[in-house]
Amino acid sequence: MANVVVVGAQWGDEGKGKITDLLSKSADVVVRYQGGVNAGHTIVVKDQTLKLHLIPSGILYPDTQCIIGAGTVVDPKVLLEELEQLEQLGVSTENLLIAETAHVTMPYHRQLDIAAEERRGSRRIGTTGRGIGPTYADKSERTGIRMLDLLDRDQLAAKLEWAIAQKNLILEKLYGLAPLEPQPIIEEYSAYGERLRSHIVDGSLVLDDAIRRRRNILFEGAQGTLLDLDHGTYPYVTSSNPVAGGACVGAGIGPTMIDRVIGVAKAYTTRVGEGPFPTELLDEVGELLGDRGAEFGTTTGRRRRCGWFDAVIGRYAVRINGLDCLAITKLDVLDELPEIKVCVAYDIDGERCEHFPSNALKFARCRPIYETLPGWQQSTRHCRSLDDLPKAALNYLKFLAEIMSVPIAIVSLGAERSQTIIVEDPIHGPKRALLKDDGTQVHPILS
């Protein structure tokens, strides 16, 4: 299998959990490299649906080691709840490891997150209110609490007493909120450390050993490319780096250790929260996509905004991540539509633009330029090969592959593992198209 990164190629919620689950059966190690409880994926265990926010999908495979990397921010309370849920269903959690240098989300982070968002008013970003941004802010300011701090009560107490004194100034003076008492928090988080002690390790050392032993490693990103702190639709982004490059920093390995990058994108586009969304549909088609796709956030429960597939941001995701291939999910959601549109470029103040603009104000002025393709108006959920697909559905996939110059390796047609078409080997199959010597494009084919 080699070492593979799975990234979201849109604004998150692309169905990475299912794709990671499919690939995890061939992995020896699965690593979550960034984000926190602001992301989530749904898994099914013994006919019961679980929503996990921190634990990698590979936890369902007893021989697969799962690592929460240093680039993540960990809410220990939520993590322990997830562990207990899995154990109650008979799923072993002994194979879960947590990087000792991962930062910890504290109660004051959640309070500050919610208070800041409320204070922004009409300028709100649309955060989940889970304290992720403030946790990463403390990490950057070098005042954060790390998992290793939870294992030394005296060290934890000293750090928390200082941190809480600083946060209380902000809570009281800026937001008019009641101050926090440090002692209960010290006791609570020290207890979390004891309960998690056996899971906390030097994550980079474990990964280095796995690499040297030629183990197959799967790196699992949260959110999506367009939510990346540096490369997304800033400021309407998350506080970490979901892009493929973030896997090396967040896991603690060198870039030469990555063999392949797989992007995941829906057959249409969704977005949660605020921010520009050129292909957003505020009509009955958008409602249909939301209803058929069950578009509600795993973490917040908020209804997702829905729109047509945006190949401009798709090409951007291919470029920023160096995608080798794509997995297209939820193709079945389009089954009822008589026609399907794909945004191939933007109109910005009367000029055609085929590239994603980094300026959020400019991006907000983008108007989609569409290509319209015929729909297939029949169910695809039973299809298990390309030959089973209606011709119009196959043509739609080919169009996406060509316009983004990247092969499609996987097509998902529902939530179940069986509702999947493996077009090409996602690990060893064809890679992204290159340019000919004369500069013309070599278009990838679907099969």
From Swiss-Prot:
Pathway: Purine metabolism; AMP biosynthesis via de novo pathway; AMP from IMP: step 1/2. Its EC number is 6.3.4.4. Disulfide bonds: none annotated. InterPro entries: Adenylosuccin_syn_GTP-bd, Adenylosuccin_syn_Lys_AS, Adenylosuccinate_synth_dom1, Adenylosuccinate_synth_dom2, Adenylosuccinate_synth_dom3, Adenylosuccinate_synthetase, P-loop_NTPase. Pfam families: Adenylsucc_synt. Its cofactor is Mg(2+). It is found in: Cytoplasm. PROSITE patterns: ADENYLOSUCCIN_SYN_1, ADENYLOSUCCIN_SYN_2. GO terms for cellular component: cytoplasm. GTP binds at residues 12-18, 40-42, 304, 330-332, 412-414. Substrate binds at residues 298-304. It catalyses: IMP + L-aspartate + GTP = N(6)-(1,2-dicarboxyethyl)-AMP + GDP + phosphate + 2 H(+). The active site is at residues 13, 41. Binds 1 Mg(2+) ion per subunit. GO terms for molecular function: adenylosuccinate synthase activity; GTP binding; magnesium ion binding. Homodimer. PANTHER family: ADENYLOSUCCINATE SYNTHETASE (PTHR11846:SF0). HAMAP family: Adenylosucc_synth (MF_00011). This is Adenylosuccinate synthetase.
